[in-house]
Structures are given as C-alpha cells and as structure tokens.
Amino acid sequence: MEITCPDWTHETAALAEGFTCVVGVDEVGRGPLAGPVTAAAVRLFPGRIPEGLNDSKKLTALRREMLAAEIHTVAEVSIAHASVEEIDRLNILQASHLAMGRALAGLPSRPDFALIDGHMVPKGLGHRCRAIVKGDALCLSIAAASIVAKVARDRIMVDLEQQHPGYGWRTNAGYGTKDHLQALLNLGPTPHHRRSFKPVHNILYQEASISP
C-alpha cells in the first residue's frame, strides 16, 4: 500500500494562478454527540513549514500538541467554533460551514484563496475556494488546520469534563462510545449534548414519555 503524505502541490498551483494569500481550512467535531464543531484556517509560509504535518487522525495526541504549538509560532492561525445551539438549530453541516467562515474571517491577513477539506465548498465564504477530498492527508495547509482544530477542540472537551464528569469526554472527545452512551442513559444529557443527534434525542424522548 502506498503511503501518501501531504505536500505543497495545491498551494503551489494556487500561487501560480496569481493568488497571494493561500490558506488551508479544516473542521473537527462533526460526529460527536457533545461539544462544539471547531474549524481552523492556517496560512503557512514556505521555509517555515513544520516537519511531520499530516492528517491529525494519523498523529498521536502528544505529536499533535507539539505540532500545534509550532504551527501557532510560524504560521497565521485562526480557530473558530459553532456552538451546540447552532448545531441543533442549523444542522451539523451548516454549523460546520459557519465555523469555517468564522475561522477565515479571524485570520490577520485576508485570504484570497482557501483550500478546504472535503467535497463541498461552503456557500457565502466570500473567498475563492477549492474543495479537496481527503485534503488533510494531501495538502500541507489543510493538514496544519486539521491539527490545530483537533487540539483546540480536545482542550474544550477536557475543560467540559471538569464541569460534567462521568461522560469520558477527556478520552472520547464527545463521540458516541459505548461508555459515553451508557453515561447518557445513567446521567442524562447535559447542556453540551446535541439534542438533534439521534442518540441524545432518543434519550430525551424517553425521559419525556415517562415523566408524570
């Protein structure tokens, strides 16, 4: 099996087209039952690209932390979120796009081209964009965005676990693991659970149906 690593090909192509501020965008947290969805936008600079960038899911937690710290030092970085309330009101896809737009808007330089992980370009970003399927494994700027977004969201979930112990958010990051689902049954949902997601909705419906 051929092992692929992200490279600078997509950034080079955009720069060759005349764009001058090319950034990578990725999000993390679409699937969890709890917590926000988090997006990051990163502008890397040739000659200052950290070694070992890759899809955040392929890296250990320690390696992600180390790379995130380096990325914040050598690159322009913006991190943004869409809240649980926004996820429930809009749906997870639209909330993810909202977080991406906020991340782009938060960069110190105004991007003129965005490389976005996935198969869909969010509407209304106000930037020229290109969607790249599996971009976090192919494009260095998107890989960097995936790392800082993952680290930022994991820290949020660790903080939330201090407020709501018992759900295992430090380790499961809000995903629907067996232990998390059991805790939902035993403890009930918190304000940080996504009511629009089926496992949480079903538990709330059960609670409502047995209430006097």
Swiss-Prot record:
E.C. numbers: 3.1.26.4
Alphabetical keyword list: Cytoplasm, Endonuclease, Hydrolase, Manganese, Metal-binding, Nuclease
Domain RNase H type-2 as annotated: residue spans: 20-209
InterPro entries: RNase_HII, RNase_HII/HIII, RNase_HII/HIII_dom, RNaseH-like_sf, RNaseH_sf
Ranges in coiled-coil conformation: none
Catalytic reaction equation(s): Endonucleolytic cleavage to 5'-phosphomonoester
Pfam families recorded: RNase_HII
UniProt GO cellular component terms: cytoplasm; ribonuclease H2 complex
Cofactor note (record): Manganese or magnesium. Binds 1 divalent metal ion per monomer in the absence of substrate. May bind a second metal ion after substrate binding.
Location(s), subcellular: Cytoplasm
Domain of life: Bacteria
Enzyme type, top EC level: hydrolase
One Gene Ontology biological process: DNA replication, removal of RNA primer
Binding site for a divalent metal cation: 26-27, 117
Cofactor(s) of this protein: Mn(2+); Mg(2+)
PANTHER family xrefs: RIBONUCLEASE H2 SUBUNIT A, RIBONUCLEASE HII
Role played: Endonuclease that specifically degrades the RNA of RNA-DNA hybrids.
Family: Belongs to the RNase HII family.
Protein name according to UniProt: Ribonuclease HII
